[in-house]
């Protein structure tokens, strides 16, 4: 639990380990219901997350993390995001993300032509993840 009642403790974890663990003034995430901003002393919440960036404002600075699905749990000024995968802005390889986007777009085209709904759904998720990583890296 964060000791100071005027800050949030924000942690982002994936199956590969902890990606982020800092204190901040404001956490902004995109849930299945829309964008959610959490400040210190917010009511407890559990929410399912979209493939989108998580932004953590820390004074004049802002950290951006590409979060690929998962959920958020917030209680007692502690926010924990458990994500399928997540990358800090500085850790994103833009060329790799661009290549992933191109592969996903090509797979989508082939799946549409073949009327392959399963492959299409997987490729659309891959495209959202690649675009998310590119957007976070370029901010």
Swiss-Prot record:
GO terms for molecular function: ATP binding; proton-transporting ATP synthase activity, rotational mechanism. One of its GO terms (cellular component) is proton-transporting ATP synthase complex. It holds the Pfam family ATP-synt_DE. It is found in: Cell membrane. CDD domains: F1-ATPase_delta. Belongs to the ATPase epsilon chain family. This is ATP synthase epsilon chain.
